[in-house]
């Protein structure tokens, strides 16, 4: 129902029967139950491109590469959002400022902890730590870099999603590719983590109305997201 209630069909005698028996028909109970569900809209936005992404390196706390020319146009995209969140890193805070003046930092949106691989090029790891890299790619519980495993990241993101379920309104969160992927895996209940690519400034929208659902926005031909 996407947060909207249709009017149940009128049938003669229903109210009379309710007054007599104290019971509502199942269709009325369904509408009452739907109206009690809090509707949460969550828009996840990946931070803008960084030099590390271009060079296929694990990230450091680096800035975004370029600033868009039309900042005003970006700010209007989610002007009516009830809450603007971002991860604590410089790149997420910079990107969040394009969409609103006062983003709120949420530590749960931080990037995966890459341990000693921070700043390391993947091509170098393929030479010097090939077995460790392969273990990390193939096993979500593996953390050969000494940081956070993919499974631990997923558990963190799952707790964060649960915390949002009682928050009505539209929440916009600027975060990292791996956090977005982990959120999608929680919603889809799938194991295809490595089959999802999250491009810089890509937008993913999730909605909670009893259960989390992935919503793929259409393209606005007038130029909006």
Report each predicted region and the residues it spans.
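Loop-to-helix element that buttresses phosphate recognition and phosphoryl-transfer chemistry
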Residues: 40-95, 145-157
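Phosphate-coordination/substrate-recognition cap region in phosphate-metabolizing enzymes
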Residues: 72-128
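Generic beta-sheet signal
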Residues: 42, 82, 167-178
């Amino acid at each position: 129902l996407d947060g909207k209630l249709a009017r149940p069909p009128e049938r003669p005698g229903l109210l009379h029967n309710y007054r007599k028996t104290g019971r509502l028909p199942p269709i009325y109970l369904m509408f009452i139950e739907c109206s009690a569900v809090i509707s949460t809209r969550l828009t996840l936005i990946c931070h803008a491109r960084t030099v590390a992404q271009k060079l296929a390196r694990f990230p450091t706390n680096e800035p975004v590469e370029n600033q868009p020319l039309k900042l005003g146009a970006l700010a209007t995209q989610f002007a009516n959002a009830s809450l603007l969140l971002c991860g604590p890193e410089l790149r997420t805070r910079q990107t969040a400022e394009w969409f609103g003046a006062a983003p709120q930092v949420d530590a749960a949106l931080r990037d995966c902890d890459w341990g000693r691989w921070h700043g390391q090029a993947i091509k170098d790891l393929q030479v010097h730590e090939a077995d460790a890299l392969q273990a990390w790619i193939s096993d979500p519980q593996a953390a050969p870099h000494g940081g956070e495993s993919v499974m631990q990241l997923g558990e963190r993101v799952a707790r964060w999603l649960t915390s949002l379920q009682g928050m009505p309104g539209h929440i916009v969160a600027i975060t990292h590719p791996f956090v977005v992927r982990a959120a999608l895996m929680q919603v889809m209940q799938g194991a295809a983590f490595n089959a999802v690519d999250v491009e810089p400034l890509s937008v993913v929208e999730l909605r909670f109305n009893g259960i989390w659902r992935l919503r793929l926005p259409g393209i606005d031909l007038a130029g909006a997201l």
